[in-house]
């Protein structure tokens, strides 16, 4: 038995519980950030915020469905945003369900259709450091993931 096999056996239940906890924390963080008015949605809007005030951004969520995986322009944007977030010490995660994200964040258009939710930034609501328990859980999750060389961990949102 190799070290990877031993490590894989031990961490499967822990990994699943860790992932579920991160998904629940992300759900709570999105709702809290939306209530506080510190949520920016959209690839271009997020890029503007990152360019103008990266020190105020605390967390980044990249979301893409399976059909979005073939969108080369979107993948290039994701790569640039990921690089910018890593360079500026902004925690970042990926979500594979844009519709679930839309159900949490809500619709932006007058027609009720969700706006561009491929990138969501969460900023500090004021000058003081924002102390949100869900944000702290996600920061720890991202830190642990980086220790396993998973720089942009994927999270599954709860139903």
From Swiss-Prot:
Keywords attached to this entry: Apoptosis, Developmental protein, Differentiation
CC per GO annotation: cytoplasm; nucleus
Record InterPro entries: GADD45, Ribosomal_eL30-like_sf, Ribosomal_eL8/eL30/eS12/Gad45
GO molecular function terms noted in the UniProt entry: identical protein binding
Entry-linked Gene3D superfamilies: 3.30.1330.30
Pfam families: Ribosomal_L7Ae
The UniProt record lists the keyword Chloroplast: no
Region (Homodimerization): 43-86
GO biological process, one term: regulation of cell cycle
Disulfide bonds: none
Family indicated by similarity: Belongs to the GADD45 family.
Domain notes: Two central helices mediate homodimerization through parallel packing.
Function: Involved in the regulation of growth and apoptosis. Mediates activation of stress-responsive MTK1/MEKK4 MAPKKK.
Subunit structure: Undergoes concentration-dependent homodimerization, which is required for growth inhibititory activity and enhances interaction with PCNA. Interacts with GADD45GIP1. Interacts with PCNA.
Protein name: Growth arrest and DNA damage-inducible protein GADD45 gamma
GN (gene name): Gadd45g
């Amino acid at each position: 038995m190799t070290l990877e096999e031993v490590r894989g056996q031990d961490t499967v239940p822990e990994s699943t519980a860790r992932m579920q906890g991160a998904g629940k924390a992300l759900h709570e963080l999105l709702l809290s950030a939306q209530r506080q008015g510190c949520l920016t949605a959209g690839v271009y809007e997020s890029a503007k915020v990152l360019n103008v005030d990266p020190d105020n951004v605390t967390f980044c969520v990249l979301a893409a469905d399976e059909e979005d995986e073939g969108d080369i322009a979107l993948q290039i944007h994701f790569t640039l945003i990921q690089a910018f977030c890593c360079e500026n010490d902004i925690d970042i995660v990926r979500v594979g369900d844009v519709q679930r994200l839309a159900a949490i964040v809500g619709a932006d258009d007058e027609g009720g259709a969700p706006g561009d939710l491929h990138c969501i930034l969460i900023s500090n609501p004021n000058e003081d450091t924002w102390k949100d328990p869900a944000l702290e859980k996600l920061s720890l999750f991202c830190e642990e993931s980086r220790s396993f060389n998973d720089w942009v961990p994927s999270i599954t949102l709860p139903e």
